[in-house]
Each structure stands twice: as structure tokens, then as C-alpha cells.
């Protein structure tokens, strides 16, 4: 069964809005912001794959693989930074990390 492109794009839009809401609502928690960004990137990946399926091109799948590689690198680096900052400040509150020494 082939899913219509409109349904795929509606689902991608809903996922993107949910990810954006997650980023905007939990601005103080770095881990929740990271989860929201990942949801938004997955929505973009779904839109690419749906469009590629509609037009019969492999470009969407290639972009999806690139997004998967980029997000895995992003998550590993971001979580390493969060663990480091949590060890130093004992919190994951983003407002605590914006203070500069000076």
C-alpha cells in the first residue's frame, strides 16, 4: 500500500511542530532541547523520503542517510558536552551554562 504524499507531509509537519514545541517549552533543559531538535530532523527526513517516493528518485533516501549520519554525530558530541558540563556545574539547566567568567 502506497501512502499518499499529502499524508506523509502532514505527518512530517506535525512532527516538526512537536519538536519545535519541545525546544521552545523546555528552553532551560539542554537534553529536552536536544530531543526536540532530533524530532525536527526526523520530520525533515520523513519529508525527504516521502518526496523521493512520490517522484521515484533516490535523492530523498540519500538525504535521509546523510541526516542520520549528521544526527548521530550531533548527538554524540552534544551528550559528551552535557556530561562534561553536568560534572562541572551539577545541573543540565541551560541558563547556568551561559554565565561567563570575567
UniProtKB/Swiss-Prot annotation:
Protein localization: Cell inner membrane
Top-rank taxon, per record: Bacteria
Keyword set, alphabetical order: Cell inner membrane, Cell membrane, Membrane, NAD, Quinone, Translocase, Transmembrane, Transmembrane helix, Transport, Ubiquinone
Record field: transmembrane: 5-25, 30-50, 62-82
Enzyme class, UniProt record, top EC level: translocase
UniProt-listed GO biological process terms: ATP synthesis coupled electron transport
Family from the record: Belongs to the complex I subunit 4L family.
Function: NDH-1 shuttles electrons from NADH, via FMN and iron-sulfur (Fe-S) centers, to quinones in the respiratory chain. The immediate electron acceptor for the enzyme in this species is believed to be ubiquinone. Couples the redox reaction to proton translocation (for every two electrons transferred, four hydrogen ions are translocated across the cytoplasmic membrane), and thus conserves the redox energy in a proton gradient.
Subunit structure: NDH-1 is composed of 14 different subunits. Subunits NuoA, H, J, K, L, M, N constitute the membrane sector of the complex.
Name of the protein described by the UniProt record: NADH-quinone oxidoreductase subunit K 1
Source organism: Geotalea uraniireducens (strain Rf4) (Geobacter uraniireducens)
Gene name in the database record: nuoK1
Amino acid at each position: 500500500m502506497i501512502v499518499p504524499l499529502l499524508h506523509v507531509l502532514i505527518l512530517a509537519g506535525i512532527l516538526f511542530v512537536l519538536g519545535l514545541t519541545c525546544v521552545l517549552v523546555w528552553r532551560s533543559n539542554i537534553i529536552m532541547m536536544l530531543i526536540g531538535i532530533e524530532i525536527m530532523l526526523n520530520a525533515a527526513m520523513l519529508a525527504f523520503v516521502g518526496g523521493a517516493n512520490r517522484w521515484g528518485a533516490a535523492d530523498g533516501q540519500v538525504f535521509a542517510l546523510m541526516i542520520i549520519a549528521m544526527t548521530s554525530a550531533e548527538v554524540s558530541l552534544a551528550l559528551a558536552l552535557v556530561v562534561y558540563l553536568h560534572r562541572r556545574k551539577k545541573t543540565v539547566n541551560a541558563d547556568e551554562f551561559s554565565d561567563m567568567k570575567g
